[in-house]
């Protein structure tokens, strides 16, 4: 009896198990077409046609289209638009995660890798491997306990002999960190640098993808939306690359409209809610009528019934129109999809040489469907009632950018136009006596909002010069509140905290090797999170010169790199710096001398980059009296929240002015006086039970002192 054992040969198809055929996906029209990138695809073909070192690796920043270049090459292979030596080749994308999954036993991983490489080698160049994120092959499969080799070392000998062809793709950073460290692996690949496309090239790529998006989302995308996506993404999303970021904007804007199309129109939804409210009221009144019959109530019920009938009739009519419009629109998209499928089959038949089937599609099927499409579009236009949006315009793209960045980019509504036109008046309600300064800042905001400012610089940069307490910081606060309805939209840096040279690290982050390197800088991180804001550098003259030097790049180019090398965009910020330099000259109305003091303290290149140097005037008596009235009104509002009724005697303003105002210290002593002399007195009397809620009080001046007089009123 023969007990010898003959092992069954392993017939597993490792390549199909752990990879995907890109050729099949192109044939099934699952891969988006690529327009452009001809130079990169030509270089890829040239490297693959070499005798040795015929393994290209695409290197570029994330989102520039490395994988799309490979898919574009495969499409050319499928269409026989490549040299003879590359015709009929099949490109498989290798799944590295699938390769390593379940390899718990020693030798299982090597078996899979060798099985794949054997299949590729035996194909005699007819199979090419594509490895996305190729840097991951370094160290993949290595086990320190078993001493197994990683996939990179298994590949090296076969790559060197030209037995297999591999296309790789990775980013510049990861190529440098992983592949370049292994010199033997690096020299087996030929680099193809994939740079970010220009705006015009990105627009061309997107125009090629437009039809695919329209068919997927069942809507129409205007060309103006594509242009807006490219321009806005380039300007407002600087930390990502074209065309990926522009594609994302169009995709999200389309998804937004698609969601709205799937939902009931707002007008029908509003009618339904109105009907529910009236039906509830009708049912309640009808129940009352049964208990106590009443002619007046009966008349009201009849009126409600009539309203309900009219609303239901309107709802049913609009619902029927909406469904009809939706059905017509869906039939258009169905025809478009059929035409696209026929175009794909036409290309396939032409490639295979089946000209009879190709001519039937070209001269009979496609013209027939195009004629049906034309009729369906005419029918849709005739029955259209604009109950739902079916188009993506630049406004939808702007809305997506606004949601992502917080920058208002939608077309100006009438209400916002009014707000901008009256911006100065709103700020002047808070900042008194500095009309020239307010106008300068407001004009800059208006230019920025209608995109007339230099797009490569911040919205505006100012130095506010003036003595303490004249409203420099208050103007910055009020600007943030009026523009963003929130004072917190202003990011404030007190420059007295940045008097040391090393404090630069606080703003942009600590350099490598120092404690806190992993943490982001206060300035750069704040602007990354809130790119549309007012930046206030309070008392800039107190900062160390090296701190002001880092602002040079911000003021000139609107960008700044943090310690991690990330580029932060300052182009949508308004930069305000306050200073007390030369305040004694400003008080004497000698502005030339104040400018000299500024020039002595700051370098010429710093001052030259500032848009406006704004002088704040000394507060006049009429202005101070207005400020006193404002402060007393604010105090009264706080008292009113506690249901306490107070009035202030007109003579009180003059008394506060004489008792507290000092030209040298500005308006701040006035606030301190009101807090100490009036607010404190009221607080004491509340605690003592003298002030109660059922009494109205008048704050007066009596014998050069503040006094509170009570008058009885009806509660």
From Swiss-Prot:
GO terms for biological process: cellular response to heat. PROSITE patterns: CLPAB_1, CLPAB_2. Residues 619-715 are annotated as: C-terminal. It comes from the Bacteria. Residues 197-406 are annotated as: Linker. InterPro entries: AAA+_ATPase, ATPase_AAA_core, Clp_ATPase_C, ClpA/B, ClpA/B_CS1, ClpA/B_CS2, ClpA/ClpB_AAA_lid, ClpA_ClpB. ATP 2 binds at residues 466-473. Residues 416-618 are annotated as: NBD2. One of its GO terms (cellular component) is cytoplasm. Its main location: cytoplasm. ATP 1 binds at residues 60-67. Belongs to the ClpA/ClpB family. Homohexamer. The oligomerization is ATP-dependent. The N-terminal domain probably functions as a substrate-discriminating domain, recruiting aggregated proteins to the ClpB hexamer and/or stabilizing bound proteins. The NBD2 domain is responsible for oligomerization, whereas the NBD1 domain stabilizes the hexamer probably in an ATP-dependent manner. The movement of the coiled-coil domain is essential for ClpB ability to rescue proteins from an aggregated state, probably by pulling apart large aggregated proteins, which are bound between the coiled-coils motifs of adjacent ClpB subunits in the functional hexamer. This is Chaperone protein ClpB. It comes from Mycoplasma pneumoniae (strain ATCC 29342 / M129 / Subtype 1) (Mycoplasmoides pneumoniae). The gene is clpB.
């Amino acid at each position: 009896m023969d007990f010898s054992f003959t092992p069954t040969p392993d017939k597993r198809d490792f390549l199909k198990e752990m990879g995907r055929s890109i050729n099949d996906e192109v044939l099934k029209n699952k891969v988006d077409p690529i327009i452009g990138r001809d130079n990169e695809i030509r270089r890829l073909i040239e490297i693959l046609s070499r005798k040795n070192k015929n393994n290209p690796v695409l290197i570029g920043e994330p989102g520039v289209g490395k994988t799309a270049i490979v898919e574009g090459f495969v499409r050319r292979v499928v269409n026989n638009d490549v040299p003879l030596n590359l015709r009929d080749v099949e490109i498989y994308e290798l799944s590295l995660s699938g390769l390593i999954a379940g390899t718990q036993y020693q030798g299982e991983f090597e078996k899979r890798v060798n099985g794949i490489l054997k299949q590729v080698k035996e194909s005699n160049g007819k199979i090419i491997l594509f490895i996305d994120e190729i840097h991951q092959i370094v160290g993949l499969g290595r086990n320190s306990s078993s001493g197994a080799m990683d996939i990179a070392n298994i590949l090296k000998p076969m790559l060197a002999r030209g037995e297999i062809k591999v296309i790789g793709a990775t980013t510049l950073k990861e190529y440098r960190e992983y592949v370049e460290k292994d010199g033997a692996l690096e020299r087996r690949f030929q680099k193809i640098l994939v740079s970010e496309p220009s705006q015009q090239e990105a627009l061309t790529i997107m125009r090629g993808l437009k039809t695919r998006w329209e068919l997927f989302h069942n809507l129409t995308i205007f060309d103006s939306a594509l242009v807006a996506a490219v321009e806005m993404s380039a300007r407002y999303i600087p930390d990502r690359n074209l065309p990926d970021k522009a594609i994302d904007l169009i995709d999200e804007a389309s998804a937004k409209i698609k969601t709205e199309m799937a939902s009931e129109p707002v007008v029908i939804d509003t009618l339904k809610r109105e009907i529910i409210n009236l039906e509830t009221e009708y049912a309640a009144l009808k129940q009352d009528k049964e208990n106590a019959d009443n002619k007046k109530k009966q008349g009201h019920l009849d009126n409600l019934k009539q309203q309900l009938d009219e609303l239901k009739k309107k709802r049913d009519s609009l619902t029927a129109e909406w469904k009809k419009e939706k059905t017509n629109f869906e039939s258009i998209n169905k025809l478009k999809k059929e035409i696209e499928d026929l175009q794909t089959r036409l290309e396939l038949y032409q490639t295979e040489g089946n000209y009879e089937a190709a001519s039937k599609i070209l001269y009979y099927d496609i013209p027939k469907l195009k004629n049906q499409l034309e009729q369906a579009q005419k029918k849709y236009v005739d029955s259209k009632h604009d109950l739902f949006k079916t188009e993506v315009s630049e406004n939808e793209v702007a809305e997506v950018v606004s949601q992502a960045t917080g920058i208002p980019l939608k077309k100006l509504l009438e209400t916002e136009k009014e707000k901008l036109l009256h911006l100065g008046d709103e700020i002047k309600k808070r900042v008194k006596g500095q009309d020239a300064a307010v106008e300068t800042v407001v004009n800059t905001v208006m230019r920025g909002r209608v995109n007339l400012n230099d797009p490569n610089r911040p919205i505006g940069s100012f130095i506010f010069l003036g003595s303490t307490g004249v409203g420099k910081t208050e103007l910055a606060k009020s600007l943030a509140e009026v523009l963003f309805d929130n004072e917190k939209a202003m990011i404030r840096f007190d420059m007295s905290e940045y008097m040391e040279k090393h404090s630069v690290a606080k703003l942009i982050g600590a350099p490598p090797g120092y404690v806190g390197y992993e943490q982001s800088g206060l300035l750069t991180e704040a602007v990354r999170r809130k790119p549309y804001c007012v930046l206030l550098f309070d008392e800039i003259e107190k900062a160390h010169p090296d701190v002001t030097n880092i602002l040079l790049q911000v003021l000139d180019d609107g960008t700044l790199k943090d310690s991690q090398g990330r580029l932060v965009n300052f182009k949508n910020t308004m930069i305000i710096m306050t200073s007390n330099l030369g305040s004694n000259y400003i008080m004497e109305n000698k502005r030339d001398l104040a400018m000299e003091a500024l020039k002595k303290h700051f370098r010429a290149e710093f001052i030259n980059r500032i848009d406006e140097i704004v002088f704040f005037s000394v507060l006049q008596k009429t202005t101070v009296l207005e400020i006193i009235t404002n402060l007393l009104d604010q105090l009264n509002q706080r008292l009113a929240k506690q249901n306490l009724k107070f009035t202030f005697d007109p003579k009180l303003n003059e008394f506060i002015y004489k008792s507290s105002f000092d030209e040298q210290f500005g308006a701040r002593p006035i606030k301190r006086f009101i807090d100490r002399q009036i607010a404190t007195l009221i607080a004491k009397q509340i605690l003592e039970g003298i002030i109660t809620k059922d009494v109205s009080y008048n704050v007066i001046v009596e014998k050069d002192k503040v006094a509170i007089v009570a008058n009885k009123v009806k509660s």
